[in-house]
Amino acid sequence: MRRLLPLFGLLWAASAAHADVRLHPLFADHAVLQRDRDIKVFGWADSGEKVTVSLGSAMVSMTTPASGKWQVSLTKRSASITPASLVVQGKNRVERTDILIGDVWLCSGQSNMEWGLGGCDDPDAIRSSGNPLIRHFGVEMLFARAPQETVKGSWAVAGPSTSGGFSAVGYYFARKVVKETGVPIGLLRSSVGGTNIECWMRQETLLDTPVLKPFADRMRTSLAQYQIDLRAWHKAVDAWVKAEAKRVAGGMDVSFPPEQPKFPFGEQAFNPRCVTLHNGMIAPLGNFQVAGVLWYQGENNAGNAFEGNQYIEKQRAMITDWRTWFGTPNMPFYSVQLAGWQKQSTDAAGGDGWSEFRDAQRRSLAIPFTGMASAVDIGDVDDIHPKNKQDVGERMALWALRDVYGRKDTVVSGPLLKGVQSGKPGTLVLAFDHAGGGLMAGKMAGRGKFEPLPATAIGGFVIAGDDRVWHRATAAVDGDWIVLSAPGVVAPKFVRYGYRMNPLDANLYNKAGLPASPFRTDPQ
């Protein structure tokens, strides 16, 4: 056997020297490639191998460098619904068919982004989902210690046999955009349930962002301890091998070896799993051009008020990180404001972790080229995974339609607090952006079903004076203004709206049927 080992080595070396030219897995049959930008195509081949890439009539060649990694750029193209073939010719020939040019949207976050259309109790959506202009690539989950270059997954065309596995939020987003614009949409889903935002950033970002320092310190401490434990384990294994040799010689059974230490940020190390998902599921996508990001995450970061307040800086750090990674400084980033969950608190003040978190999400709109689709009104008391993903996806699509697709008259958001001032004695007057034709009371009565309510029914507001004793307020609509008062508050100064984990009484909308974001005006 020992004589055969060198031969196996030579055979492996010979096969490696004549490895097939390969494309990155993102370039597969049915792929959507980003329009209006130079198209980067990349993969692997032998050092020195000439690689020629063609897409339709466009063709470009290069010689593979010593690293074995090649990348070419094809001239940018407009959106096209005509399928094309992508061909790579080296020592072998690789062809990918049914390629469209359109917009690729990265769908990331936790389980509510991962949630498939098949789990939404919407069989009509699946039955009618056949559309060659909507495609989906699901990135296989991978926690990685170091940045990876490749992923596992495949492209699928929307249809009754495939759409059940699509990200539901992504699918409803794409369905609306395609209907309005005719531009092919590729959904690049890279999401994992139960994950913190810290999982999705590069290590450099984690280390350089002050608010993330506790996670960075925990990461360094855990990795240092892991190295100590690993060295001790190697010594224990050496001792075990020697001891077992004697046991075997004496005719005894072999015992179990010492247990290997677990890597501290692997799949089973549930919290916080820093960096590892960026390494495994974002880093490999970096050269693949995308139009923007759809982000539904936060349940794992909303556990308490302190975490909620910090989220704006964490999200700012991650957005900057991703825009740098994808080489697009103004990349659109649209997030979902957390849906309501569990029973409504009877405490007038509210102020739990989820309410603080939603307010941080609202304030994150100050980050340029971002948008927020509120889902606060379409939650589920009993399920952290509400089935109504249609309104979530379509509300995200509104931002894209206005900011990416030029539909400038689109109402993209529900009312957002603009300012507050004292009115007549005993009242506060609130002004709102995104009034959308006027403020009103309303409710959602199912997917895509908005029902107006009498103006006198507006709820969800509480006010307080300097004493910070909160009282439920009566709200009156005055055009794009809300006037608040409460019998127990002579000199109101502060207001909160929908400031609970599940604010079922918060029902302020604009006439476009979009809900107001929860907020607070008292200092935190």
PLM-predicted stretches and their roles:
Residues M1-L4:
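Positively charged n-region of N-terminal signal peptides that target proteins for export
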Residues P6-F8:
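Sec-dependent N-terminal signal peptides
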Residues A13-A14:
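N-terminal signal peptide c-region/cleavage motif recognized by signal peptidases
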Residues A19-Q524:
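Cell-envelope and extracellular/periplasmic
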